Regions:
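Primarily short, surface-exposed interaction patches in extracytoplasmic proteins
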Residues: 206-282, 287-547
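Solvent-exposed helix-loop boundary motif
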Residues: 1-4, 8-95, 111-138, 146-211, ...
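Protein kinase-like catalytic domain
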Residues: 16, 22, 27-30, 101, ...
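A eukaryote-biased signal for short, well-structured alpha-helical docking elements
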Residues: 95-108
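Short secondary-structure subsegments characteristic of cysteine-rich extracellular domains
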Residues: 86-98, 311-312, 505, 509
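Acidic surface patches and DE-rich sequence motifs
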Residues: 141, 166, 435
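Inter-heme linker and motif-flanking segments adjacent to c-type heme-binding CXXCH motifs
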Residues: 106-109, 143-145, 189, 378-382
């Protein structure tokens, strides 16, 4: 049905989005299309209404004869339109646009967007390949009202080989498997996972011994999916796998013989080998290399001496098994000379507030904030305002030459300006980040809530950020590292890619990831405990041979 009085924010803008008019490939592009520009995906309603009613003396709107408005003539291809026909006269979308024009193109600035959406049903199972499943998208508004917005929402399949979905949320099953479905509506996002079961007649579950909670969570899903896992790998396979995963090196012939000749039960000696390798010199070297990649240790930015100092610093942290939250906090709050405090090299590498923020959120939270620098994130909840509010935490980071550098410099090319070998990182008393759209200084603010200890009025902005980011209550911090370690050891993360946590990219086993995250936090952010827990699971020790 067409609303009696269409509201631009809640009725018209969703239609414009669904028709594709404000997409990045159309009028939502940076410079618009053919002289007409809209805000990308409608994130700025005031700008869009003015574009329709004020630009070019208001030629796009005809209040006296709404059907003759260029806005409608273009969308119906009644006049030439490079974007083709987007709507037909008489259809609901057309009527909503027409009624809005007929009633004066009003914009109620107090009108609120949906605060959240939900997809119904949650995690449905399609029993037979070829069957259909209708999804509904329901929007919830701040005043407590809700309504079905399936027609206006976008629903997309993340695995089109398993299931596809049409414009009105009707899912078609293609083959056995799982397909995450992402629904988005006016900046709100929700997901569900479709399971296509297929013919599993004759399936019988065989009870298996769970080595720990990881196996219990995995078995719950195997039962639901009607899958029998592979058997355990042989001792020969296990010893090679473990050495490669924990030390990056194949075991020596002597190590293999010693393990195979040990008369102890297989399970017992496997646990002993895990405990033996976790924390040894080769283990420390291997995981130091991984962190060298993550922290971008590079002579180009630090010089040979600075790169060596930075690497030696976090090698000692890994060797001492520093809790992950403390490790991250030392980096985030680092100041002083990167010669005396090598952790400060993190800032010497990145330097600019926006680059520091993008890298920090990507590395420690597995979120991608670079997409919302120029506009609201098109496929996530992150906004352009949040980009600059987060960057503001690094706005006062500054650098000055460390006298111990003497006459040693790095860079000096046309691309890389010359900088002292060692620099002192410090926090200025002033300095702000300017918001691209508003031109005003951004006020530091977190993109989501997380309880943390600390007084906002004490310490630097980075201290406050570090307390928030490393909090046990932060939904992304521990989860992102747990998923990263799982991916390193298992070859694929519970979330893939490893550094892309978002609503439209749900974990393959949410219950397992939740338990692992909670266990990691309760262990005191002990990375070695996490690695041991994964390696001692039945899941880790399964054979590569298909059941």
């Amino acid at each position: 049905t067409v609303p009696l009085k269409p509201d631009f924010v809640q009725d018209v803008n969703p239609v414009i989005s669904k028709l594709g008019c404000n997409a990045g490939t159309c009028h939502g592009a940076k410079d618009g299309k053919n002289g007409f520009k809209l805000s990308l995906r409608g994130y700025d309603p005031l700008y869009d209404v003015r574009a329709f009613t004020d630009d070019l003396a208001g030629r796009r709107i005809n209040f006296a004869s709404p059907d003759d408005s260029l806005m409608l003539l273009k969308s119906t291809s009644a006049v030439p339109h490079e974007g083709g026909q987007r709507a037909k006269p008489g259809e609901p979308f057309y009527q909503i646009l027409r009624e809005w024009i007929a009633q004066g193109c009003v914009l109620d600035l107090k009108s609120a967007k949906a605060s959240s959406i939900e997809v119904i049903p949650q995690n449905p199972v399609i029993q037979s390949i070829g069957d259909l499943q209708q999804l509904r998208v329901v929007a919830h508004f701040p005043d407590g009202t809700q309504r079905d917005v399936t027609r206006e929402a976008f629903v997309e399949s993340s695995n089109t080989e398993v299931a596809s979905v049409n414009d009105v949320g009707l899912v078609s099953s293609i083959r056995r498997g799982e397909a995450p479905m992402l629904a988005r509506y006016e900046g709100a996002y929700a997901s569900t996972t479709i399971t296509v079961m297929g013919d599993r007649s004759g399936f019988e579950w065989v009870d298996l011994k769970a080595f720990n909670k990881i196996d219990e969570a995995a078995m719950t899903k195997w039962k639901r999916m009607r899958i029998l896992p592979s058997g355990l790998c042989s001792d020969t396979e296990f010893v090679r796998r473990l050495y490669l995963d924990l030390t990056g090196l194949p075991p020596s012939v002597a190590s293999i013989r010693q393990f195979l000749d040990d008369p102890k039960p297989s399970g017992e000696k496997r646990e002993m080998l895990i405990d033996q390798l976790v924390g040894n010199r080769e283990f420390v070297d291997y995981w130091t290399n991984k962190w060298a990649d993550l922290l971008q240790v590079n002579r180009k930015f630090l010089g040979p001496e600075g790169a060596s100092l930075f690497r030696d610093w976090f090698r000692k942290e890994i060797e001492g098994n520093t809790p992950y939250d403390q490790f991250a906090r030392q980096i985030l709050t680092a100041d002083g000379s990167n010669k005396e405090n090598p952790a400060a090299a993190y800032y010497k590498i990145l330097r600019e507030p926006d680059l520091i923020m993008e890298n920090t959120t990507h590395l420690f939270l597995a979120t991608r904030f670079n997409c919302n620098k120029c506009h609201d994130h098109p496929f996530e909840r992150w906004t352009q305002d949040q980009y600059y509010e987060m960057s503001a935490y690094f706005a006062r980071v500054s650098f000055k030459a460390d006298p111990t550098s003497k006459d040693k410099y790095i860079g000096g090319t046309a691309v890389e300006g010359r900088k002292p070998l060692y620099e002192i990182v410090y926090e200025k008393d002033e300095g702000e980040v300017t918001h691209l759209r508003t031109g005003k200084s951004a006020v530091p603010s977190f993109p989501y809530e997380a309880d943390f200890d600390g007084n906002e009025k004490e310490g630097t902005r980075r201290n406050e950020l570090a307390s928030w980011m490393t909090s046990p209550d932060n939904a992304y911090f521990a989860k992102s590292y747990v998923n990263r370690i799982w991916g390193y050891l298992m070859g694929m993360g519970l979330i893939e890619p490893l550094d892309d946590i978002r609503a439209g990219n749900p974990p393959s086993n949410p219950e397992l990831l939740e338990w692992l995250t909670q266990d990691f936090v309760e262990s005191g952010f002990d990375a070695r405990h996490l690695i041991r827990t994964i390696c001692k699971s039945r899941v880790y020790q399964l054979s590569i041979e298909t059941n």
